[in-house]
Amino acid sequence: MPIFGINNAMVPILAYNYGAGHKDRIHKTIKLSVMYAVTIMLLGLATFQLIPDKLLLLFNASDDMLSLGVYALRIVSLSYIFAGFCIIISSVCQAFGHGLYSLYISIGRQVVVLIPAAFILSKIGGLNLVWFSFPMAEIVAVLLSAFFLKKSLSSLKFDNTAEKTA
């Protein structure tokens, strides 16, 4: 949830600085937003790797649920490493009027990779392998995010006089 707060703060900052022609501030805002988001997600990853059982016990998990849930949380949380970057970049694309790029990232993650990977992995190794579809999907989303970030930033038009007067 804190990452969505970062998004909500970042979008108007990007829009303002784009309008003002401050390319350097745009890059700095994106860099800081990604850095904070990835740091937050690394904390989440560490939590789910170190104490998944304690988190599940907050919800009165049975022994069966614990044996299944601890493994699942540890595998799924590996995707957190990549998710922070993807969430921020989706919003960057939207901030610059490239909402379709954000949609492509989301469809790539959910429809093109996650669902087919979960299906295939369930046939190969059952439920234990299904959890790996989440990190797989997020890795593809990172690649798509990087591609669309570059495309989005390269399409921005700046008035060079605005940078000189700022």
Predicted feature residues:
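Residue-level recognition of transmembrane alpha-helices
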Residues: 37, 73-76, 80, 106-107, ...
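Hydrophobic alpha-helical interface/terminus motif in multipass membrane transporters
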Residues: 14, 55-56, 93, 120-121, ...
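Small-residue-rich hydrophobic transmembrane alpha-helices
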Residues: 1-46, 50-52, 83-102
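Membrane-interface helix-loop junctions in multi-pass transport and translocation proteins
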Residues: 52, 58, 110-143, 153
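Generic alpha-helical transmembrane segments of integral inner-membrane proteins
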Residues: 38-50, 81, 85, 111-116, ...
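Short membrane-interface helical motifs at transmembrane helix boundaries
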Residues: 43-66, 70
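Alpha-helical transmembrane segments of multi-pass membrane proteins
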Residues: 3, 63-89
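Intrinsic disorder in cytosolic terminal tails and internal cytosolic loops
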Residues: 154-166
